[in-house]
């Protein structure tokens, strides 16, 4: 298996960094089916998605494991931001880039979304008909986690309190220009 680091932009002008895995005995004159692999929330392409990419390349696919916008070696500020629009667009930008490679069969491009990227991959496949196959692994519904807390841990009262805090923080940011960045995982579940 050969690995090539590649860079390409999404429609939000964010530079994405990916690793393309080519199968053994790769022949640039042939047309290959391709798989785009999305990583778990908080991970990078060299971890889980890279392992899936290696295994699927071993099975004859050209694979692309990318760092999502704001993560790893990809661009985007502030770092570690979760933007559903950008993360869904990252899959379509990956389809764009792969489909421009002369050795890719444009009618055989699929996606594997792992954990947090699973939900974004489902959304991408529903919006982009160029994605011909979809698989998710341990898919996590980020929308539900945002609305209800991890493991549905928030009560209605806690949710209303959090929304009030978010509203107040938005006013502070509008007044001062200073963003408050916090990570979404509570210290105790």
Where are these regions (language model features)?
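Active-site glycine-rich loops that stabilize anionic/oxyanionic intermediates
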Residues: 32, 39-44, 115
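Alpha/beta-hydrolase active-site loop
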Residues: 48, 81-102
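N-terminal cap/lid segment of alpha/beta-hydrolase-fold proteins
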Residues: 1-30
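The serine-hydrolase catalytic nucleophile loop
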Residues: 42-54, 68
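Conserved alpha/beta-hydrolase
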Residues: 55-75
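Alpha/beta-hydrolase-fold enzymes
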Residues: 120-189
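Glycine-rich "HGGG/HGxG" loop immediately N-terminal to the catalytic nucleophile
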Residues: 47, 69-82
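Alpha/beta-hydrolase fold nucleophile elbow
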Residues: 102-115
């Amino acid at each position: 298996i050969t690995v090539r680091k590649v860079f390409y932009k999404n429609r939000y002008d964010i530079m994405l960094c990916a690793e393309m895995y080519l199968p053994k005995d790769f022949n640039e004159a042939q047309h290959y089916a391709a798989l785009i692999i999305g990583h778990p929330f908080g991970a990078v392409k060299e971890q889980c998605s890279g392992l899936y990419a290696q295994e699927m390349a071993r099975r004859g696919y050209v694979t692309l494991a990318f760092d999502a916008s704001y993560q790893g070696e990809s661009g985007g500020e502030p770092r570690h931001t979760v933007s559903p629009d950008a993360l869904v667009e990252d899959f379509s930008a990956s389809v764009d880039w792969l489909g421009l490679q002369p050795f890719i069969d444009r009618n055989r491009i699929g996606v594997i979304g792992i954990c947090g990227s699973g939900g974004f991959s489902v959304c991408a496949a529903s919006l982009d008909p160029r994605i011909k196959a979809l698989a998710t692994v341990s898919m996590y519904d980020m929308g539900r986690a945002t609305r209800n807390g991890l493991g549905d841990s928030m009560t209605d009262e806690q949710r209303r309190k959090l929304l009030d805090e978010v509203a107040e923080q938005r006013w502070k940011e509008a007044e001062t220009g200073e963003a408050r960045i916090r990570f979404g995982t509570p210290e105790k579940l």
